[in-house]
């Protein structure tokens, strides 16, 4: 916690200015993933957002190109309190809410199974 406080105090990112936040306290991973999210949205391709770091990148992408939120699918709600706060800002709901904090793409894998099952049910009921 103190490292984050010190980093923010030293670098003084302008809250609400996604590019400034990215430049001052973001990493290459955040920049790259934000670009993938924006690029997908510009092509109308959804992106699965999985976990706290990916959600931080999604928040940056949203700050740069708000339309991209329409193309974000959130795999799960992490037990990390910051995750819920970021999702509230993005106004997005997770596919799975099981208090997970496992990493390694576990949330995305589970969310894909849920989505596939929902599609199967829809297709069978629509016949």
Where are these regions (language model features)?
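N-terminal loops that bind phosphate or other acidic moieties
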Residues: 1-127
